[in-house]
Amino acid sequence: GAGLSGTKPTPLLAARLDKGVELWEGGGRKAVIIASGGRGSDEQVSEAEAMKRYLVEERGVPSDAVMLEDRSANTMENLRNSKAIMDARSGAGAYRAAVVTSDYHVFRTAEYAHKIGLAADGVGSKTARYYWPTAFIREYVAVSNAHRWPFAVIFVLWLIPVALWFASFVL
């Protein structure tokens, strides 16, 4: 989602990674970071690989503290594949994850995590102000697509008074 610039994370993705490092350091550097993201058709490396390089080379995270999930193509796959890694690592033990994403994307990510049974807290990194309009539209479309009926009902309920108002000028 946040993409790459060549083989490096975009500023949007780097902000997510920086927030993840902040949490990791705040937690005593005990957790494992899962860098999650596949390789797009126009990308030279997977997002996960680029993320790990950034974390290790730019942020000084030990290589063995970062695991790769490099098969996913969207948010739901990121979460499912990462959950499978966490489930395998924990055995039958309970765990709680922090899912770091951009602040505009936390609601949908947390909703997906809940849907697949992933005990996780959504944590948002800051998004540049210029990107907010695009991000808002993208998330609105994604959330409304996932909840078609409630959004359709709300739209119709909104449309009725608008139609009546418009009709008052025509009649």
Label each PLM-derived region with a short phrase:
Residues G1-R138:
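A structural signal for short, hydrophobic/glycine-enriched beta-strand patches
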Residues A142-L171:
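C-terminal single-pass membrane-anchor helix
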